[in-house]
């Protein structure tokens, strides 16, 4: 299993998940198997893993060979978990490592990154609507809305206008072609000085999120997760940008047990609790250590939230 990447915030994930023998855990985003490998190596437990990317099937096959009946894999989006999992068999923990994987970013032919000149694809499942189809067919208004909503890009209108003008001359089919159109629209040097990122970064993020319907999948799965988890089961989510983290934060806080304020004259030392399902294990977000960021710069934007299900 030489192709397994070191997963982000591995120590923190294991600490909050606290896996033990004879329990079952769900890895929503298998990727190259980093989290699954850590959990399976930590104790004699079982893993059920999901990933919609067919490129990871060969890696999952290696896990079947090594872990036999301790490992089960489904080549599908984690939002479809309910279709595969028995309602009577509750999970003891769920881990989610959101966003695009290092494997996908590093595969030039997948079209996720403008570090390579490749076909503008960006599909995690390698099925359906390509990014090139979006940028060549969507209206200027639609493009601006997508770039602003999913990329939080303040210059969305300007970028959308330049994309439409460029495609009138020649179809936009490659990553570098699109990146250069964006850079021409908003500049590069001044944008980098102000934002510390390439001027194409936010637009590429926006298109990827839209193409793969990432945010609604996160929201829909989180809504399912309370039914899937057993009491004392743990939910661990690692996100990489504010849009993902906002969904996770809102979900956990909305479903958290809260203490009810009472009079300072009350003799009841233990505060009564409002209805809720989750106990927050992370009162604030957990972030990577400085050492991890130095060793793995891609971890710098990672944010981890964890919660414990304490009742049905």
Swiss-Prot record:
* Subcellular compartments: Cytoplasm
Q: Which GO molecular function annotations are given, in alphabetical order?
A: rRNA (cytosine-N4-)-methyltransferase activity
| Enzyme Commission number, as recorded | 2.1.1.199
Principal subcellular localization: cytoplasm
* Entries under Pfam families matching the protein: Methyltransf_5 (PF01795)
- Which GO biological process entries does UniProt record here? rRNA base methylation
List residues binding S-adenosyl-L-methionine: 33-35, 51, 78, 97, 104
Q: What class of enzyme is it?
A: transferase
This entry carries the following GO cellular component terms, namely:
cytoplasm
* Top-level taxon of origin: Bacteria
Report keywords, A-Z: Cytoplasm, Methyltransferase, rRNA processing, S-adenosyl-L-methionine, Transferase
Quote the InterPro entries the UniProt record gives.
RsmH, SAM-dep_MeTrfase_MraW_recog, SAM-dependent_MTases_sf
Q: Which family does it belong to?
A: Belongs to the methyltransferase superfamily. RsmH family.
Function text: Specifically methylates the N4 position of cytidine in position 1402 (C1402) of 16S rRNA.
Q: What is the protein named?
A: Ribosomal RNA small subunit methyltransferase H
Which species does the entry assign this protein to? Orientia tsutsugamushi (strain Boryong)
- What would be the name of the gene that encodes this protein? rsmH
